[in-house]
């Protein structure tokens, strides 16, 4: 995992997280 300095969530990161969850879920 990459070390995160800032806890700021970008829309792209959220989209990637959701996409991964959906793919795993399938």
Curated annotation (Swiss-Prot):
Record field: catalytic activity: Preferential cleavage of polypeptides between hydrophobic residues, particularly with Phe or Tyr at P1'; substance P + H2O = substance P(1-9) + L-Leu-L-Met-NH2; substance P + H2O = substance P(1-7) + L-Phe-Gly-L-Leu-L-Met-NH2; neurotensin + H2O = neurotensin(1-11) + L-isoleucyl-L-leucine
Record flagged with keyword Transcription: no
GO biological process: bradykinin catabolic process; hormone catabolic process; proteolysis; substance P catabolic process
Protein name: Neprilysin
Co-factor remark: Binds 1 zinc ion per subunit.
Membrane-protein topology: Single-pass type II membrane protein
Enzyme Commission number(s): 3.4.24.11
Family indicated by similarity: Belongs to the peptidase M13 family.
Lineage: Eukaryota, Metazoa, Chordata, Craniata, Vertebrata
GO MF annotations, alphabetized: metalloendopeptidase activity
Function: Thermolysin-like specificity, but is almost confined on acting on polypeptides of up to 30 amino acids. Biologically important in the destruction of opioid peptides such as Met- and Leu-enkephalins by cleavage of a Gly-Phe bond. Catalyzes cleavage of bradykinin, substance P and neurotensin peptides. Able to cleave angiotensin-1, angiotensin-2 and angiotensin 1-9. Involved in the degradation of atrial natriuretic factor (ANF) and brain natriuretic factor (BNP(1-32)). Displays UV-inducible elastase activity toward skin preelastic and elastic fibers.
Keywords attached to this entry: Cell membrane, Hydrolase, Membrane, Metalloprotease, Protease, Transmembrane, Zinc
Cofactor: Zn(2+)
Highest taxon listed in the record's lineage: Eukaryota
Main location: membrane
């Amino acid at each position: 995992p990459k070390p995160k300095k800032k806890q700021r969530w970008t829309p792209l990161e959220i989209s990637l997280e959701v996409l991964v969850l959906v793919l795993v879920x399938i």
